Swiss-Prot record:
PANTHER family (alphabetical): LOW AFFINITY POTASSIUM TRANSPORT SYSTEM PROTEIN KUP, OSMOTIC STRESS POTASSIUM TRANSPORTER
A GO CC term assigned to this protein in UniProt: plasma membrane
Cellular location(s): Cell inner membrane
Transmembrane segments: 10-30, 48-68, 94-114, 133-153, 159-179, 210-230, 242-262, 270-290, 331-351, 363-383, 388-408, 413-433
Protein name: Probable potassium transport system protein Kup 1
Annotated function: Transport of potassium into the cell. Likely operates as a K(+):H(+) symporter.
Organism taxonomic ancestry: Bacteria, Pseudomonadati, Pseudomonadota, Gammaproteobacteria, Legionellales
Disulfide bridge positions per record: none
Provenance organism: Legionella pneumophila (strain Paris)
GO molecular function: potassium ion transmembrane transporter activity; symporter activity
UniProt keyword list: Cell inner membrane, Cell membrane, Ion transport, Membrane, Potassium, Potassium transport, Symport, Transmembrane, Transmembrane helix, Transport
Topology of the protein relative to the lipid bilayer: Multi-pass membrane protein
Superkingdom of source: Bacteria
Length: 624
């Protein structure tokens, strides 16, 4: 389902969701970068030149022109990229699998830091009104974040349409503030010349190199452009960037620089200081609204990433709540929301100011960009069939830039940047253990089972006691291709329903599955059929709804009413064994067993959208 259409409505929507993070970077990026060095014209022009060319090369060229080509049938993001690699059956799948799940973990860590630094930096504008208000910055920011996370369960369907216009107001506001300063001191326009960036780095030496860690803050949020392709399409995102976001950001950065050339003492808060005093309070309100929207976009993106991971079988079936009946992409993941809330509040309370938060922010995003570069470079060779020379030249440049930023960000590891990285390793390990455990179950407990059709013959199926008028639907999980729930039912009961449907779902490596490819059916007996339902990794799995559509289209050889049928699911009870080694480590087996016990029964029923009052769980026992 490729999304190349363009409308101004989509462009406005993209402005509100895609550019919230990168659009609020002027609140803190220039202040953090220039802190600790002399505030003079040479240094300001050098830093502005680095900002200008970073936005042009990293965001405008690398992401919007090159990385955008690596979409998976219109969907972007690191997990969609992983699915694309799997779809092409590359021999390096295991490597990219590890890379992708680590990258997903990094994005979750970023989802903790972005709301913290964005909201705190906006509320710090209160200090421009009065020094006496500084002590209230952290409590107010914390209150805003508490409200933000507590309202996630309500969804954004009612107010989401306002995000685009509100962020547009934000961009227009910061652009006007920048223009007013540039008109007074147009000398800052010299920074467009890359000479000033090079001269600054040469003159500052090692100190100048480490200042790239601050420069990188202006491109954080650039990864959201690729991740949100599926929501708005490539062309609306490109339009919003080149005609609104990029010009407004540059005007504001250059405006801050122009003001600092003549008023270097205002480095304490250069963003708010370019506004006239009478506009401080309105600007604080606008900035706070913009940062809340930016935070909401990051939280929603994390929810979407989690849903992709669940559907691709990379993590357990944690509860996913649909918050809108009209838009399938509007979801709420309670457990992820709680983790993000705890992490965000911990960062706020531990670091207290945007300056301190900036010393931890960026390294996780930097690593994620580096991983995406590597995956897209391989896609360019193996899928796009680019020449090796062109790939080495182009992506060598990208990797060199990202590695340069990463080197400059390394000092952030010990000042708080280690938290999202350690979290990423932990999440990646959980995903790896879950995936490896499912593969072990499939290969050792289910793959060796005898074919159902043979078992039916051995049991003399037609001679079994029939339950006339009863229809039963047996749901089998992704690791079970043999119909385990049905076989266990036969063992426990020597009677069978009149109509039996064994349902297995498969999540394909594409975002959406066309109706013509949705169903596969195999008749095992006159009244026993096996149905495979295909879903895309961006779709919501709803077994009853899919079955109802199949009945309406007369796909099944027998008639039954989905609203009265009984559903059967198999719940494996996994036990770890010290004597028998299945996974790499005993504690890894314990982790997998814990996840299976806590994310199987009720969550399977919720995941498949099965009716609780007509669903029976059948237990089975597996020793690893």
């Amino acid at each position: 389902m490729k999304k190349n259409r363009f409308t101004y409505g989509l462009a406005l929507g993209a402005l509100g969701i895609v550019f919230g993070d990168i659009g609020t970077s002027p609140l803190y990026a220039l202040k953090v970068t220039l802190s600790g060095i002399p505030i003079n014209q040479f240094n300001i022009l050098g830093v502005l030149s680095l900002i200008f060319w970073s936005l042009i090369i990293v965001v405008s060229f690398k992401y919007l022109m090159i990385i955008f080509r690596a979409d998976n049938d219109g969907e972007g993001g690191i997990l969609a990229l992983l699915a694309l690699m799997k779809h092409k059956s590359t021999k390096y799948q295991p490597v990219f699998y590890i890379v992708a799940i680590f990258g997903a973990g990094l994005l979750l860590g970023d989802g903790m830091l972005t709301p913290a630094i964005s909201v705190v930096s906006a509320v710090e504008g209160l200090g421009t009104l009065s020094d006496k208000l500084y002590p209230y910055v952290l409590p107010i920011a914390s209150l805003i974040l508490v409200l933000l996370f507590s309202l996630q369960a309500k969804g954004t369907a009612r107010i989401g349409y306002l995000f685009g216009p509100l962020i547009l107001i934000w961009f227009i506001t910061i652009a006007i503030l920048g223009i007013l300063q540039i008109l007074e001191h147009p000398v800052v326009l010299k920074a467009i010349n890359p000479y000033y960036a090079i001269a600054f780095l040469v003159d500052e030496g090692l100190r100048g190199y480490f200042l790239l860690g601050g420069i990188f803050l202006v491109v954080t949020g650039g990864e959201a452009l690729f991740a949100d392709i599926g929501h708005f399409g490539k062309n609306p995102i490109r339009f919003s960037w080149f005609f609104i976001a990029l010009p407004c950001l540059l005007l504001n950065y250059f405006g801050q620089g122009a003001n600092l050339i003549v008023r270097p003492e205002e480095i304490s808060n250069p963003f708010f200081m370019i506004a006239p005093p009478w506009f401080y309070l309105p600007l604080i309100i606008i900035a706070t609204v913009a940062t809340v929207i930016a935070s909401q976009a990051v939280i929603s993106a994390t929810f979407s990433l989690t849903k992709q991971a669940v559907l691709l079988g990379l993590c357990p079936k944690i509860p996913i709540v649909q918050t809108s009946m009209l838009h399938s992409g509007q979801i709420y993941v309670p457990q992820i929301n709680f983790i993000l809330f705890i992490g965000t509040m911990a960062f706020c309370l531990a670091f207290k100011t945007s300056d301190n938060l900036a010393h931890a922010y960026g390294i996780a995003v930097n690593l994620e960009m580096l991983l995406v570069d590597a995956m897209v470079a391989y896609a360019a060779v193996s899928i796009w069939r680019w020449s090796t020379f062109n790939v080495i030249f182009l992506f060598g440049l990208f990797l060199l830039i990202d590695l340069a930023f990463l080197g400059a960000n390394t000092h952030k590891f010990i000042t708080g940047g280690w938290v999202p990285i350690v979290l990423a390793f932990f999440i990646a390990f959980i995903m790896y253990s879950w995936r490896y455990g499912l593969e072990y179950l499939r290969d050792n407990f289910y793959m060796n089972k005898e074919d159902i059709s043979k078992i039916l013959k051995q049991l003399q199926y037609k001679s079994l006691n029939q339950l006339p008028g009863v229809s039963a639907i047996f749901i089998t999980d992704v690791y079970d291709k043999s119909g385990g729930s049905f076989l266990h039912f036969l063992k426990l009961n020597r009677s069978v329903p009149e109509n039996v449907l064994i349902v297995n779902y498969i999540v394909d490596n594409i975002p959406y599955v066309h109706y013509s490819q949705r169903y596969e059916i195999v008749c095992l007996d006159e009244k026993v059929c096996k149905l495979v339902i295909h879903y895309g990794f961006m779709e919501t799995i709803n077994i009853p709804r899919s079955l109802e559509k199949a009945c309406n289209k007369n796909i099944l050889p027998f008639k039954f009413n989905v609203d009265t049928a009984t559903f059967m699911v198999e719940i494996p009870n996994i036990m770890a064994s010290k004597e028998k080694r299945s996974l790499s480590f005993y504690w890894q087996e314990k982790l997998f067993a814990f996840l299976m016990r806590n994310y199987s029964a009720n969550l399977n029923i919720e995941f498949y959208k099965l009716p609780y009052n007509r669903t029976i769980a059948i237990g089975t026992y597996c020793i690893l």
